[in-house]
């Protein structure tokens, strides 16, 4: 419908009708970041993200990549790398306008495709 980007991010569970499917992707993304992506050397995560066309951005996270899946449909990966005190953590985020463009089912597919490509595995069955 041509809704502009708001600049405000939401999780998949905050998506319209996203509590069940979106929440599942949020939990899965957090697990994949903690177990697989957040333990990579930053240079390797950068290489993987750039190979998918992502742009790296300054952020409050240790690492932030924006994947422009479609016009007006960015997906951000934010990662806080593991250290001596805390395990890695992170999440996938969407612009608040995302529900204007894709259903929650399609949004979950987008998120799982990104995660699968970054890990080279199929952690999330669509």
Label each residue range with its predicted role.
Residues 6-12, 61-63:
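Long, Pro/Ser/Thr-rich low-complexity/intrinsically disordered regulatory tracts in eukaryotic proteins
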Residues 1-2:
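Beta-strand-rich luminal/extracellular ectodomains of secretory-pathway glycoproteins
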Residues 21, 33, 65, 98-102, ...:
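Conserved aromatic-histidine-acidic binding/catalytic patches
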Residues 80-105:
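Intrinsically disordered, low-complexity regulatory segments enriched in Ser/Thr/Pro
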Residues 55-81:
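Amphipathic, interaction-prone secondary-structure segments
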Residues 96-126:
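Long, compositionally biased interface segments
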Residues 15-62:
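Negatively charged, low-complexity tracts enriched in Asp/Glu with abundant Ser/Thr
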């Amino acid at each position: 419908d041509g809704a502009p980007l708001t600049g405000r991010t939401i999780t998949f569970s905050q998506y319209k009708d996203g509590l069940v499917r979106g929440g599942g992707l949020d939990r899965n993304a957090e697990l994949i970041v903690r177990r697989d992506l957040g333990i990579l050397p930053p240079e390797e995560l950068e290489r993987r993200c750039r190979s998918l066309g992502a742009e790296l951005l300054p952020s409050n996270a240790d690492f932030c990549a924006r994947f422009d899946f479609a016009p007006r449909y960015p997906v951000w990966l934010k990662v806080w790398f593991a250290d001596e005190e805390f395990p890695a953590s992170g999440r996938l985020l969407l612009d608040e306008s995302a529900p204007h463009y894709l259903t929650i089912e399609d949004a979950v597919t987008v998120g799982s495709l990104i995660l699968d490509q970054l890990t080279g595995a199929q952690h999330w069955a669509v």
